[in-house]
Amino acid sequence: MMDLSPNNQIEDRKPILTADGLVQTSNSPFEPTISQETQTSNGIGGQCHLTVDQLDIEILPIIYDIVRCVEKDPLENAVKLRESQDCNHKIFELQKRFESAREQIRQLPGIDFNKEEQQQRLELLRNQLKLKQQLIRKYKDTEF
């Protein structure tokens, strides 16, 4: 269903089946409708949502390298200085990977919901599933 928003932009409002069996045309609080124009003007449209399987977080090899670097105890000052610089570089690389991981995690869908909101959403989805299963059973039992 296409409606005009208060600022005269076209919004796509999909009908939603509520837990009590009613069809609701306004969106749920968990999935707000934002027009494509509003998304791109707010900078939202550029972010794509990742899944957990798509996360690229590799920190163990760097941590291993840092531990190996710290365990080395060279006797010469020149070697100590070079090893110290290598360790600092690896630590900086680890910090960059942590920041990259934070950015990726921020793109996960639902990450901005707290535990209670997630539980409410899960309960709503379970109720919808039960209702749809009942409707399917009722439809299959109906003879034409």
From Swiss-Prot:
Pfam families: Med9. GO terms for molecular function: transcription coregulator activity. It comes from the Eukaryota. GO terms for cellular component: mediator complex. The keyword Transcription regulation applies. GO terms for biological process: regulation of transcription by RNA polymerase II. Signal peptide: none annotated. Residues 85-143 form a coiled coil. Its main location: nucleus. Keywords: Activator, Coiled coil, Nucleus, Transcription, Transcription regulation. Belongs to the Mediator complex subunit 9 family. Component of the Mediator complex, a coactivator involved in the regulated transcription of nearly all RNA polymerase II-dependent genes. Mediator functions as a bridge to convey information from gene-specific regulatory proteins to the basal RNA polymerase II transcription machinery. Mediator is recruited to promoters by direct interactions with regulatory proteins and serves as a scaffold for the assembly of a functional preinitiation complex with RNA polymerase II and the general transcription factors. This is Mediator of RNA polymerase II transcription subunit 9. It comes from Drosophila melanogaster (Fruit fly). The gene is MED9.
